Each structure stands twice: as C-alpha cells, then as structure tokens.
Amino acid sequence: MTTKIQTVLLTGKTHTTGSRREGAPHGDDRLDLQLSTPGNAGNDIAFTAIQAHPAAEQLFAGAWSACYTGALGLVAKAKKVTLPSDMSVDIEVDLGKTGSAYFIQARIDVRMPGVAHDVAEAIAQAAHDVCPYSKAVHGNIDVATNIVATDAVAA
C-alpha cells in the first residue's frame, strides 16, 4: 500500500535527454551535469574506478545521506539525545547484476562519537522510519546499516 502525500514540501525536477552515456539530467539551473556510465555494465569487464562525472548511484547516495542525516537529528531530538558535531553518515550504493537482472544495494555507516553504541543503533534504526529515502527503498533493496565505533560505553 502506498501513502499519498497531502502537502508537497519540495519538488526536485530534472529533464534527461538520452541515456547516462548520451545525456544529462538538468533542472532549474542549479543542477546541470553529465553523468558517467558505470563502465561497460553489459560485459564482465572491470568498471572504471574514478569517473570524470558523477554516477547516478552517487547522486542517489548523496541525496539519501543528506535526508537520513536529517532524520537522525529528528530522532535524536525526540529521544533527548544530543548528537556530536562530528557525527557522520557514509552511504555506498552498489549497482550490480544477478543473472541478467540489474539491482542496487546499499551500505550505511553511521558514526556518532561519544554516543553509546546501543543508543546510536536505536537512533539509526528509527531514522529509517522517518527518512523518505529509506522508506522508499525498504523491502526493495538490500540495505545494511552499521554503527561505526562510538567510543562510548553502553547506556
């Protein structure tokens, strides 16, 4: 079951011509870029490690991490936990194949120095219920959320 939005807060709009290789998404003069292809994805050839332009997976990871970081802040505030100023989120989105079908999967590393591991883990998991990107992919892709060393004892 899908949930309909009652009030639209923001609309991100792009117009794409061609494919990743041939075209580029552009929107309202704030986003105008050329995307790189993920190498020769149709063959079993190693992908280029460094691309001249961002890949769609990087853009998705960037948008998701910004949203998820905000969700962490909302959840922490509700739980009366002060997040450290050096808290960080790293999201990696993989494009891959199983048989002839293409899929994405993601890894999220959350760092909350000074926050007890169990508290950080509870905040990180609850943030998935708040973040629209996490909700969009829930049950659709494999997502591993990891709490990276917090340097604090259990609460």
Language model segments and positions:
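Extended beta-strand/beta-hairpin segments
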Residues: 1-155
